[in-house]
Regions:
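Hydrophobic alpha-helical segments within soluble ligand-binding/sensing domains
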Residues: 398-420, 512-532
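Segments of small-molecule ligand-sensing domains
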Residues: 529-660
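A short, basic-hydrophobic beta/loop patch
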Residues: 103-118, 123-156
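An alpha-beta-alpha
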Residues: 320, 408-448, 537-559
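Extracytoplasmic "Venus flytrap"
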Residues: 298-318, 323, 336-342, 432-434
Length: 661
């Protein structure tokens, strides 16, 4: 290869570098490579580990070890010095070698820090190879390991180091703990399972195929990284599809998830919790015309079980019947049952859409990803999933502030517990449940300062109700009534009840779910043109309505003493009017920390993510290993510690790879 050809390549690279320099300066960014010595903290005590010879992903080489000669390159290692300089001569000679028979054979020397590489020796080799689009550059690498801290990025990096031991892959660099486990679960691999060379090649090829499709969306990396986008995509589609989809098909599926990817990466920043029912009664005719509000709606309900086997489904079906009474011929209502898993739910949801559904309520939290998949494939249909804290902008989620009703039944329990001991049977350690336990405990403490709440869980081994009663506890709070029907309170398997001296169970009161009120609110809002989603909107909307909206209620027993009944009614009125806050008081946790000094309440996000218990509660939140297998899926989906739960395997190890080799 002639020197003149190499010189022509240098001049081309120089023009690219000059253009990049101008663009970066115009954007107010540094036009030069990053300098590792400037990034590392002063008095740096990070350890250094020899990694050895690595095929470094070219795009991960972002800087130099020291500041010397950085002005010779742009941030992407394009040259900046004149073509007659000594620097240019060396660059041209390297270029000629690369284009000739010998090639560039010597590996570069560099440092790796938090997944990025900084060149100590071989800057011009990087410049030449990147100019010709080399996807990987061989280098001898030393890794700088930062001290382990609570910072999510550092925790994720420590997970990366374990991931690298098995995979020898640098192409994915997650920023959030738990993401490597999620990726391995999608691939059907164990965390310590060594990757074969064919597996590395396959993953590299598929990841870069996905990255190219994602890059076309031009999402800023500070919002979403390609590997973060891949995780959400893999929640909906199997890994092997990356080897089967055309470029156009892949780009379409990725583009449909754009805003969900942004919302899912931002997590809590992207979740908007709406605690009030919108008043749509005052929408003007002009507003309704502009919003193109419909005159008729086809509404579908998709349930994980059926009314004969699930009181939860029965409650939602009663909510559907409420819609029929309120809207009459303006709505067409259909129900679909036994969507027992996400896989079984997908064709059922598709059938609902094929039947003309314009609004689909999916009443089971474990079906949230099936809901999302349907939503991105049918963007004109409105999808809602009965769950909380889901960071997806394509769907809306809904649940009730049941803790408000628990506060009232707690006050009743405190007044009725003659021995000051009260049993509480909780369902799952999921978002909002600790708030309900604490609200109940605070209510009991209000009427009985000596009250102690003995906590049990129905999602672990044992017989909590029998155990509590056998232990001498006479007042017990159990699961909430699924509907307003009085029979659930009388059963004494729901709500709060008392065992008298004869061993009879006497009902006291129960929280109730009034799903019809929520469904009426949503449908009325759509009729009034209140359902809006702007293009490019990456906010996830979670409805979390309470007693002031009528979605949550309390049924009181006629057997309550008159004074207790009257006091419960006062509390109920205060919560319905929005003037009473169960948590606006001094609160101390089990470990002695003061969670509130009484001058403020808690924000909805704080209540949903509450992971501590009040100091008058005896008991603890179970670990994931203690939870019964039948209950684990719910906890994976909505658990207060879901980000720390080991990833669930999706098939046998290597199954996905074996299928596509």
């Amino acid at each position: 290869m002639s020197i003149q050809t190499a010189l022509d390549e240098y001049n081309l690279a120089l023009k690219q570098g000059q253009r990049e320099y101008r663009e970066l300066v115009m954007e107010g960014r540094s036009p030069y490579p990053a300098v590792l010595d400037d990034i590392l903290p002063e008095n740096n005590t990070d350890s250094v580990v020899d990694v050895g010879l690595v095929e470094i992903p070219s795009e991960r080489i972002i800087g130099t070890k020291s500041a010397g000669r950085i002005t010779a390159f742009t941030a992407s290692f394009c040259p900046l010095l004149d073509s007659k300089s000594e620097f240019a001569t060396k660059w041209v000679n390297l270029c000629a070698a690369h284009l000739g028979d010998t090639g560039i054979t010597d590996p570069i020397l560099c440092y790796e820090y938090l997944g990025n590489f900084y060149v100590q020796e071989g800057n011009k080799r990087v410049s030449v190879l990147r100019h010709f689009g080399s996807p990987r550059i061989p280098g001898t690498v030393k890794r700088i390991v930062p001290p382990l801290t609570d910072e999510p990025r550092i925790q994720a990096y420590y997970e990366f180091m374990d991931f690298y031991k098995a995979s020898h892959l640098y192409c994915v660099q997650f920023r959030h703990p738990g993401d490597y486990a999620r990726l391995l679960a999608h691939l059907g691999k164990k965390s310590d399972e060594i990757w074969e060379e064919s597996e590395r090649r396959t993953f590299n090829a598929y990841f870069h195929y996905f990255r190219d499709a994602f890059s076309a969306l031009q999402v800023p990396p500070e919002e979403v990284l390609p590997e973060e986008a891949l995780l959400l995509w893999l929640d909906l589609y199997p890994f092997q599809d990356l080897g089967q989809l055309s470029t156009a098909e892949l780009k379409k599926s990725v583009a449909a998830l754009r805003e969900d990817m942004v919302a899912n990466t931002k997590k809590q920043e992207a979740v908007k919790v709406q605690t009030k029912a919108e008043d749509t009664s005052k929408a003007s005719l002009l507003e309704r015309f502009i919003s193109a509000s419909p005159d008729h709606l086809n509404v579908a309900f998709v349930h994980q079980m059926n009314p004969g086997s699930s009181t939860w489904v029965l409650g939602h079906e009663e909510g559907k019947e409420h819609l029929k009474k309120v809207f009459g011929d303006r709505v067409t209502l259909r129900s679909y049952f036994d969507a027992a898993s996400p896989e079984l739910a997908e064709p059922i949801i598709e059938q609902a859409v094929a039947d003309g559904a314009q609004v689909v309520f999916i009443t089971a939290p474990p079906l949230s990803r099936a809901t999302l998949k349907a939503a991105v494939e049918h963007p004109k249909v409105r999808f809602l999933n009965c769950s909380v804290d889901q960071a997806y902008s394509s769907i809306r989620t809904y649940y009730g502030r049941i803790y408000e009703a628990k506060f009232i039944t707690g006050a009743i329990a405190g007044a009725m517990a003659q021995n000051n001991r009260i049993g509480y049977i909780a369902s799952y350690p999921i978002f909002g449940v600790p708030a309900s336990i604490n609200a109940f405990a605070l209510g009991a403490q209000m009427t009985n300062p000596r009250a102690q709440i003995e906590l049990r869980w129905s999602c672990v081994k044992g017989t909590p109700q029998a155990d509590l009663l056998a232990d001498g506890i006479r007042v017990v709070s159990n699961r909430d009534a699924p509907t307003q029907a009085k029979m659930y309170l009388d059963f004494c398997n729901y709500g709060t009840y008392l065992m008298n001296d004869r061993g009879d169970l006497i009902p006291l009161g129960t929280p109730i779910w009034v799903w019809g009120k929520f469904y009426e609110f949503v449908i009325r809002s759509i009729f009034a043109g209140g359902w809006k989603r702007d293009k490019g909107e990456s906010t996830a909307l979670n409805y979390w309505l309470g007693m002031d909206s009528g979605v949550i209620g309390v049924r009181l027993s006629e057997k309550l003493p008159e004074g207790v009944h009257q006091f419960a009614e006062i509390l109920k009125k205060g919560l319905e009017d929005g003037v009473l806050d169960p948590f606006r008081r001094r609160i101390t946790a089990q470990d002695g920390t003061v969670k509130s000094d009484g001058t403020r309440g808690f924000a909805p996000e704080e209540l949903l993510h509450m992971d501590w218990l009040c100091d008058n509660i005896v008991g603890s939140i179970p670990t994931f290993d203690q939870i019964l297998p039948i209950s684990q899926q719910m906890v994976r989906e909505l658990g207060i510690y879901r980000d720390k739960i080991p990833a669930e395997k999706e098939g046998k190890p290597r199954e996905d790879f074996d299928r596509i080799r």
